[in-house]
């Protein structure tokens, strides 16, 4: 699902403007995602800037897609205008005003309001890096616009194939982009390593997304008017999109969701293999990957026995104590494939905590 190579317009931003953009990016990141703020902090120099920029651009697109209060055609048009802004500096400066009517999380809206600064960061990257970031953000945003237009009354995934397609657009693209950035900016990821990683990079991105979809079933249905569990699978177990959060159908719905938990487990195992293929010399890249992966395994473990994500107002979250324990254990284990496999097996089985770590 690739398109033409996009060559961004080259302009010269002042050093002061680039510093302002870098400060903004680093300050807004924890308001958008605490987990990725930690992970991106491990990445050095231009690689860190490239991943920070890419992540913020993806979250801008995601914020547009998720606003269920704005008309679908308006959101689709905003996504397309956002893509124009990636390549045209004048459009970049005008975009925040065009998107000012969006509703959503305060941190995400603050990010959208300074899209112009994020695009200054984009223009500060090496030329080839800019091209690859634009290529994959374009792939993501066009896919989002497609689903917004296909489901003007709220996304209602119908089949497993459509579920996979959606996950590719919103997350598989991220795995592809990150892998290209590892190759370009990390000497330890040469052509041979890149080719091996490329086979599983889409699964790496999609694995984390599928866990998020499963833990946020109720939130997405209530607050974003989006249901990603396919109608076909719900119907096979005697339920439907209309009864997804019905207490009377909770066991029917859990049987349908159990299949997607199994699929997510397979995806996560592919994502683990992806990480284990990253050369141990690329410690920063391993550090970036390990925490989201461990958190996803822990969340999926809890999802397997929970019904909370299928109740109004419910969600599934691992404890703060386990988060802190996994941060310590993950960073210690990441240098050894054997130790990391052991840790994953432990996390799959039961909550992982250190007795000395406070909640």
Each language-model region and where it sits:
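Catalytic cores of Mg2+-dependent Asp-rich isoprenoid enzymes
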Residues: 1-207, 214, 218-359
């Amino acid at each position: 699902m690739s398109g033409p190579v996009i060559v961004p317009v080259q302009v010269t931003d002042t050093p002061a403007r680039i510093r302002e953009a870098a400060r903004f990016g680093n300050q807004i990141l924890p308001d958008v995602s605490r987990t990725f703020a930690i992970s991106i902090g491990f990445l050095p120099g231009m690689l860190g800037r490239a991943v920070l920029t890419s992540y913020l651009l993806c979250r801008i697109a995601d914020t547009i897609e998720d606003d269920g209060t704005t008309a679908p055609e308006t959101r689709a048009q905003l996504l397309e205008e956002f893509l124009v802004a990636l390549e045209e500096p004048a459009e970049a400066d005008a975009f925040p005003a065009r998107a000012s009517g969006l509703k959503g999380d305060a941190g995400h809206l603050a990010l959208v309001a300074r899209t112009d600064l994020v695009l200054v960061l984009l223009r500060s990257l090496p030329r080839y890096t800019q091209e690859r970031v634009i290529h994959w953000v374009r792939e993501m945003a066009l896919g989002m616009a497609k689903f917004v237009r296909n489901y003007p009354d709220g996304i209602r995934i119908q089949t497993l194939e459509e579920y996979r397609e959606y996950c590719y657009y919103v997350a598989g693209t991220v795995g592809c982009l990150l892998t290209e950035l590892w190759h370009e900016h990390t000497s330890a990821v040469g052509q041979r390593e890149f080719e091996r990683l490329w086979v599983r990079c889409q699964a790496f991105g999609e694995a984390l997304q599928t866990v998020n979809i499963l833990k946020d079933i109720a939130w997405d249905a209530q607050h974003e008017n989006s249901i990603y569990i396919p109608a076909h699978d719900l119907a096979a177990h005697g339920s439907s999109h209309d009864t997804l959060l019905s207490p009377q159908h909770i066991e029917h719905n859990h049987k349908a969701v159990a299949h997607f938990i199994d699929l997510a487990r397979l995806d996560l195992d592919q994502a683990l293999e992806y990480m284990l293929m990253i050369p141990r010399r690329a410690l920063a890249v391993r550090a970036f990957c390990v925490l989201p992966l461990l958190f996803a395994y822990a969340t999926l473990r809890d999802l397997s026995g929970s019904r909370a994500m299928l109740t109004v107002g419910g969600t599934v979250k691992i404890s703060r104590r386990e988060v802190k324990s996994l941060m310590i254990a993950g960073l210690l284990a990441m240098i050894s494939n054997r130790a990391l496999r052991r840790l994953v097996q432990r996390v799959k089985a039961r909550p992982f905590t250190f007795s000395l770590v406070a909640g």
